[in-house]
């Protein structure tokens, strides 16, 4: 499928990861017609590309590229975030949209898959510049989205502030209030738990991994948890780990890693909140590293990721920054440090080489002796799940309580885990005592659900 495409390394990686999983299972033996479905689902239904012209504070005209990849609507309206970052290109958005199809399928909610964004960099921009950019971006995007067509959300570089600016422009142009974006403010249609959802969700997912692998004897209590990133996902994953009795031993950002000095202790909830405050101001964690309260307890390593810089044992790893942030060598280092569970809070957080290392170790070691890897499309589905719950609340013009949303999130993550587990057992036969492959189970479960819907719609035959 890749030979007639332009060079799109990120999308090619995502496609090959799914295709190899399906090939290495018994799915195509049992249902060979699904090979055709894979060819069809790998081509987006629509790709929208446009210019975004806006004025900076000096009165100068600035030009950026805007995109929306409407990948698949078999299960519902296109659903996926908007990313504002200078690295954004069509390959990255196609990879994210492709992953989003199957992630959304795993939630059990009626959502298709899509992704969008721009190569605009919000860092260093004033509020007025960001507002002017968002207005220009939405002026074009509004022609292609709607509550029953395509419902974007936030992603890297797109917080509640940007969602608000874009929602306001959509409302002005279309003269209607509808749930066309998720991640909205709580006072105007947003859902409680939405900012926390991805981070909380990945921890809830790993809870089930720990309980299954230990036969119900273990939990997060006493676990040393290495986390990368320091945005929403990392912050709320860290807070939930601390709440459940675990120790958070690292965070990071694009400039470097902040790791615990020594083998005892943890980030506290107050320290996580301090990091959250500087991130709202778009500052780097390096600025905290020199403060007395942090320098005595933590070590800052410029230009590094945390995985090979942590003293002592690592029980759980949660990559929560960006794609391909765990390499093959770092995967081996995590195993050497005693890591037993790795779940991606970020999308495609591990390179294919790293996934191969994790899966080979799981295949070669029975039960609790192995590292158990969970892919982002399953482990970080909590964010889009609560976006789906926000859509449901908007449609019904109701607001659910924090407890109601959190309860539904926990159930969705439990179902997501059990679905991947049972599907892996059905289509992939491991050696005696070996844990099932969650990457295989999640890929197959998401793919078969979408493929069946597409077949019934006449998209392939």
UniProtKB/Swiss-Prot annotation:
Its EC number is 1.4.1.4. Keywords: NADP, Oxidoreductase. The active site is at residue 115. One of its GO terms (molecular function) is glutamate dehydrogenase (NADP+) activity. Pfam families: ELFV_dehydrog, ELFV_dehydrog_N. Homohexamer. InterPro entries: Aminoacid_DH-like_N_sf, Glu/Leu/Phe/Val/Trp_DH, Glu/Leu/Phe/Val/Trp_DH_C, Glu/Leu/Phe/Val/Trp_DH_dimer, Glu/Leu/Phe/Val_DH_AS, Glu_DH, Glu_Leu_Phe_Val_DH, NAD(P)-bd_dom_sf. SUPFAM superfamilies: Aminoacid dehydrogenase-like, N-terminal domain, NAD(P)-binding Rossmann-fold domains. PANTHER family: NADP-SPECIFIC GLUTAMATE DEHYDROGENASE 1-RELATED. PROSITE patterns: GLFV_DEHYDROGENASE. Belongs to the Glu/Leu/Phe/Val dehydrogenases family. Gene3D superfamilies: Glutamate Dehydrogenase, chain A, domain 3 (1.10.285.10), Leucine Dehydrogenase, chain A, domain 1 (3.40.50.10860), NAD(P)-binding Rossmann-like Domain (3.40.50.720). GO terms for biological process: glutamate biosynthetic process. This is NADP-specific glutamate dehydrogenase. It comes from the Eukaryota. One of its GO terms (cellular component) is cytosol. It comes from Penicillium chrysogenum. It catalyses: L-glutamate + NADP(+) + H2O = 2-oxoglutarate + NH4(+) + NADPH + H(+).
């Amino acid at each position: 499928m890749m030979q007639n495409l332009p060079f799109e390394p990120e999308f090619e990686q995502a496609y090959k990861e799914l295709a190899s999983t399906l090939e290495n299972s018994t799915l195509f033996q049992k249902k060979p017609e699904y090979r055709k479905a894979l060819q069809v689902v790998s081509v987006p239904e629509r790709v929208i590309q446009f210019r975004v012209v806006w004025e900076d504070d000096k009165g100068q005209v600035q030009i950026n590229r805007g995109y929306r990849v409407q990948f698949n609507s078999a299960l519902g309206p296109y659903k996926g975030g908007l990313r504002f970052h200078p690295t954004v290109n069509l390959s990255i958005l196609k990879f994210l949209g492709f992953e989003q199809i199957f992630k959304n399928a795993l939630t059990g909610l009626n959502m298709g898959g899509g992704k969008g964004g721009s190569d605009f960099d919000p860092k260093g921009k004033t509020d007025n510049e960001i507002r002017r950019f968002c207005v220009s971006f939405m002026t074009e995007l509004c022609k292609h989205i709607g509550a029953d067509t395509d419902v974007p959300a936030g992603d890297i570089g797109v917080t509640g502030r940007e969602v608000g600016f874009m929602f306001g422009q959509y409302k002005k142009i279309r003269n209607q209030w509808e749930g066309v974006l998720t991640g909205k403010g709580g006072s105007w249609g947003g859902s409680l738990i939405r900012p926390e959802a991805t981070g909380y969700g990945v921890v809830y997912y790993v809870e089930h991994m720990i309980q299954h692998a230990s036969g119900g004897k273990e939990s997060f209590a006493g676990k040393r948890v290495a986390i990368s990133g320091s945005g929403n996902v990392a912050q709320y994953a860290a807070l939930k780990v601390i709440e459940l009795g675990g120790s958070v031993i690292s965070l990071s950002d694009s400039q470097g890693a902040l790791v615990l000095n020594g083998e005892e202790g943890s980030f506290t909830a107050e320290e996580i909140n301090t990091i959250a405050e500087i991130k709202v101001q778009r500052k780097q964690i390096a600025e905290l590293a020199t403060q007395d309260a942090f320098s005595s307890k933590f070590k800052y390593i410029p230009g590094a990721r945390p995985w090979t810089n942590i003293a002592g044992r690592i029980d759980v790893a949660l990559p929560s920054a960006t794609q391909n942030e765990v390499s093959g060598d770092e995967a081996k280092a995590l195993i050497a440090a005693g890591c037993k569970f790795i779940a991606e809070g970020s999308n495609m957080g591990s390179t294919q080489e790293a996934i191969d290392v994790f899966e080979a170790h799981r295949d070669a070691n029975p039960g609790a002796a192995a590292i158990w890897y969970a892919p982002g499309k399953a482990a970080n589905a909590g964010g889009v799940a609560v976006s789906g719950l926000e859509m449901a609340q908007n449609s019904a013009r109701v607001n659910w309580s924090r407890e109601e949303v959190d309860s539904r999130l926990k159930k969705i993550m439990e179902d997501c885990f059990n679905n991947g587990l049972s599907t892996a057992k059905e289509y992939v036969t491991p050696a005696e005592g070996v844990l099932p492959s969650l990457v295989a189970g999640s890929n197959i479960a998401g793919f078969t659900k979408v493929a069946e819907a597409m077949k019934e719609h006449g998209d392939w035959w």
